[in-house]
Amino acid sequence: MAGKPKLHYFNARGRMESIRWLLTAAGVEFEEKCMKTREDLEKLRKDGVLMFQQVPMVEIDGMKLVQTRAIFNYIADKHNLYGKDIKERALIDMYTEGIVDLNELILTRPFLPPEEQEAKLAQIKDKAKNRYFPAFEKVLKSHGQDYLVGNKLSKADILLVELLYNVEELNPGATASFPLLQALKTRISNLPTVKKFLQPGSQRNPPDDEKCREEAKIIFH
């Protein structure tokens, strides 16, 4: 029997947090190996396990996977979170790319110089309210189903709910005008594994902050 997936990153949300969300929603227990020094990263590179010399990296099923989207897709396909046919997968991928576009602004913000963070926050609030949230609310309204695609839980639903949490941490009440998104958030938050993940003391990381920025400098620069 294969062991638990092992996640290689540093002690932050960053690009690994969405992977944590997907594994959690799929009911998969995982281990983490957190880099703390530049030497930890260099050892992974020297060992030849980082194809493009970068993390996140996930050890799973005998593979050492890098590139976030590839990791998303493997987890989703393995755990039946990727639609029933090629058309559903295309929609799931399309929605996921939109989610990732906005989440990218959020996950990079804490690592910007402090004087640039306020402008980035304003951009996040604007794009969430006027571009991304209305688009996903419209999708849910168009078919009246519980999930974005095929009336079945997919990676897009999970990553969207992570995004909703991320935006609301920065802008409380951001989903107030989007009742279907709120309902989706509640639905997925009540999945037993996700409910546990959202509790204090779980493997969910706190929001990235100045401490994470300093750790990243030590490891990556």
From Swiss-Prot:
Domain of life: Eukaryota
Tissue specificity field: Liver.
Domain GST N-terminal: from-to ranges: 3-83
Domain GST C-terminal residues, every copy: 85-208
Entry keyword set: Cytoplasm, Transferase
GO cellular component terms, semicolon-separated: cytosol; extracellular exosome
Catalytic activity: RX + glutathione = an S-substituted glutathione + a halide anion + H(+)
InterPro entries for the chain: Glutathione-S-Trfase_C-like (IPR010987), Glutathione-S-Trfase_C_sf (IPR036282), Glutathione_S-Trfase_N (IPR004045), GST_alpha (IPR003080), GST_C (IPR004046), GST_superfamily (IPR050213), Thioredoxin-like_sf (IPR036249)
GO molecular function terms attached to this record: glutathione transferase activity
Classification via CDD domains: GST_C_Alpha, GST_N_Alpha
Quaternary data: Homodimer.
Matching PANTHER family: GLUTATHIONE S-TRANSFERASE, GLUTATHIONE S-TRANSFERASE A1
Function description: Conjugation of reduced glutathione to a wide number of exogenous and endogenous hydrophobic electrophiles.
Name assigned to this protein: Glutathione S-transferase Yc
